[in-house]
Amino acid sequence: MTIDHEVKRRRTFAIISHPDAGKTTLTEKLLLFAGAIHIAGSVKARKASRHATSDWMEIEKQRGISVASSVMQMEYRDCVINLLDTPGHQDFSEDTYRVLTAVDAALMVIDAANGVESQTLRLLQVCRARNTPIITFVNKLDREVREPLDLIDEIERTLGMDVIPFTWPVGSGKRFHGVYDLRHKLMRVFRAGMDRVEQEETAIITNLEDPAISERFGANLEQARQEIELITGAAPEFDQTAFLAGQQTPVFFGSAINNFGVQEVLDTLVELAPPPGSRKAIQREIQPAEKKFSGVVFKIQANMNPAHRDRIAFVRICSGEFRRGMNLKVVRSGKDVRTSTVVSFLSQRRELLETAYAGDIIGIPNHGTLQLADTLTEGDHLQFTGLPFFAPEIFQTVEIADPLRSKQLKLGLAQLGEEGAIQVFRPHIGSMLLLGAVGVLQFEVVTHRLKHEYGVEARIAPAKYQLARWVTAETPQELQRFIDANAHRIAYDAVNAPTFLASFSAEISVAEENWPGIRFHKMREHAGLMFQTAG
C-alpha cells in the first residue's frame, strides 16, 4: 500500500457539543456500529459497572461529564476512522480548541429540545475560522423537543451556513415514529428501548403513499410530508465543495441512546468527510502524502494509567508514514524521541503501534521531553502553527497541609500543567505557585487529581490577580527593565515566558501607556511565540 492510498483511507474528526447534548453517548454508539466495541456503556447508568468508553478519568465516571479529550481509532468500510471525543464542559474549551486543530472535520451534536447553545456556538466559531467541514446530528428526538423547522432556522442563522437536511423527523417525543431519508427516499422506523445496546436492524418503509402507512402514523406523517415539501423547495442542493469549505452542513435527526440515526451519520462521515489535507508550518505548507514523517503534539495527558504515573503525548501525524523504531527529532530541542513504545488508542485502552499514516493520532510516552505544540520530524526543521495558549481568566493560590509532600505537589502541578488543562505560574518574587484557568471546574479537577493520582491534599484559594498578559519587547534589555520595575507582578509559565499579572484591566492599560516598548499578549503559541495583542 502506498502512503497516498493510506492517507486517502483516513477520516479524522472531533465530536463537539454543549454539555448534556448526548455527545459521549453518540461516541459510544459510533464505536458500536463500527464494530469497535460490543456493548455501549450508558453515560447515565453510573450505578452500573459500565461507564462510557470515552469517559475514563475517575472524576468523569463520578460526575458523568467529559473533562479530558479521548482519542479512539476504528476501521469501518475500508476506512480508518480517528474519532476525538472532546470535553463538553465550558471550562475545558481551551483543550477542546487544541483538539480541533488536529482534525479534518467535526460532528456537531445538538439537543433537539435546546437548539444551538453557547458552548456549541463558541466551538463552531473555531471550526468556521478554520473552514472545518461540519456534519450536524440533532439528538434526543424521542423526547419532547422544539419544532424541527425552528431548529433548522436557528442552526442556519447562528452558524451562518446553509443547512441541508439529509433526514427529517416524523413526529417527536412519545409520537416519534422515525425519520424520512431525503437522499434515498425512504422512511426508517423508530423503535424505542433504552436498554438496547446491541446493533439492531432498522425497519424501512419505501412506499409512504400506502394508505396503511398513513393510517399507522397519522397526522405526524402528514406534517412531516408538508415540512419536507417546504424544505425541499427552500434548501439548496447539497454541494460537496461547499461542504468541504465549511459553507454547508448536512443535518441528521435521531436518538443516539436508542441507536437510531447513528448508522447514517457514520456512513456519511466515511463518504463525505475529507481525508487529511495539507498543514501550515512557518517554513512551508506540508502535504500529507510526503514521504517524510512530520507530526505535532496537540495534547499531553498525565496518568492515563495511574499505577505507572505515565504521560502520553498525543501526536497528529501531518505527513508521511510512522514506523515503529524510526528515529524522530523534537525540532524545538533537537532531542531524539524513542518510538519503540508508541501506541494507538481506544480511549484508555492502548495497543503498540507498528505503522501509522498522516491523519492518524498516535501516543508517545513522554517523560518531559515533549511539550504541547512540539513538532516531530525525521530531521527537517519545521514548526507547525495554530496551537494556542490562552491567558487565564481566574487565578488561585495553592498550598498543602503537609509540607513533606511539597515535592509531590510540584511534580503533580508540573505534569498537569504540561497537559494544558491548568496553567502553573512561578512568581518572580516569592515561592507560592499560582494556578491559572479559564473556568472554575478546572481547579476542582486539579485538586481531585492531585489527591487521587499524586497523594497530595491541596488547598486552593482565590488569588489577588484576575488578569494575565504575556509580555515581549524588541530587545532583551527593555524586557528586563520592565520585569525589574514590576517584579511583584511578574510570573513565569511552564516555558518560562514572562507574564504580567493584574487585578483590574485598568492596571494593564496604565502599564501599556507607561511602557510603549512592551507588548502585552492575550495568547501565545509554541515556546513563547506570540500572537494577538491585548484588547
UniProtKB/Swiss-Prot annotation:
Principal subcellular localisation of the protein: cytoplasm
Q: Which domain of life is it from?
A: Bacteria
Question: Which Gene Ontology molecular function entries are recorded, alphabetically?
Answer: GTP binding; GTPase activity; translation release factor activity, codon nonspecific; translation release factor activity, codon specific
Looking at the record, the residues that make up the tr-type G domain are 8-277
Q: Which InterPro entries match?
A: EF-G-like_DII, EFG_III/V, G_TR_CS, P-loop_NTPase, PrfC, RF3_C, RF3_dom_3_sf, RF3_GTP-bd
Instruction: Spell out the subcellular localization from the entry.
Output: Cytoplasm
For this record, an example GO cellular component is: cytosol
The record lists its disulfide bonds as: none
Where does the UniProt annotation place the signal sequence?
A: none
Enumerate the residues binding GTP. 17-24, 85-89, 139-142
Any GO BP annotation: regulation of translational termination
* Residue ranges that the Swiss-Prot or TrEMBL entry lists as coiled coil: none
- Gene3D superfamilies to which the protein is assigned, alphabetical: P-loop containing nucleotide triphosphate hydrolases, Peptide chain release factor 3, domain III
> What keywords were assigned to this record?
Cytoplasm, GTP-binding, Nucleotide-binding, Protein biosynthesis
Q: What does this protein do?
A: Increases the formation of ribosomal termination complexes and stimulates activities of RF-1 and RF-2. It binds guanine nucleotides and has strong preference for UGA stop codons. It may interact directly with the ribosome. The stimulation of RF-1 and RF-2 is significantly reduced by GTP and GDP, but not by GMP.
Report the sequence similarity comment from the record. Belongs to the TRAFAC class translation factor GTPase superfamily. Classic translation factor GTPase family. PrfC subfamily.
Protein's name according to its UniProt entry: Peptide chain release factor 3
Native organism: Nitrosomonas europaea (strain ATCC 19718 / CIP 103999 / KCTC 2705 / NBRC 14298)
Gene that encodes it: prfC
